[in-house]
Amino acid sequence: MLRDWIKENTKSDGTTIIVNENISILPPRTFDGITGLQEVVLPKKLKKIGILSFAWCKGLREIIIPDGVVLIDDEAFRGCVNLEKVNIPSEVVGIGKMAFAFTAIREIVIPDSISIRYIDKGAFYGCSMLDKKCLNIPDGCDFIKD
């Protein structure tokens, strides 16, 4: 099944994955636990990053989430202990429970024009490197769950 999700030019050593352009939803656990994964190229048509899609991908250092993504689901990047940098596109309406928990995120870019409605419980739990001054929650966010 994984072959359906990745392009032929993906590195055979598993360090880089290029997701097929026709994919709009990453289902739960798509790349969960691929510890050697260092780089992911997500398609422009992507709308949703599913539950645990990249959980425990310990080699992942940066993720560029394409414009058009509306949901980063529960625990999507949980345990990506080397993930330091992430951008949140302006179309995102929700960040799920523990979505970025236990990562090494130092700074998170959330645009002022974001249409976000919620950041769920513990979305950034255990992110000890994240300086709260670098987490700017825009006015458009209706609520942050405890």
Language model regions located:
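Consensus positions within tandem repeat domains that build extended binding/scaffold surfaces
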Residues: 5-6, 27-30, 50-53, 73-78, ...
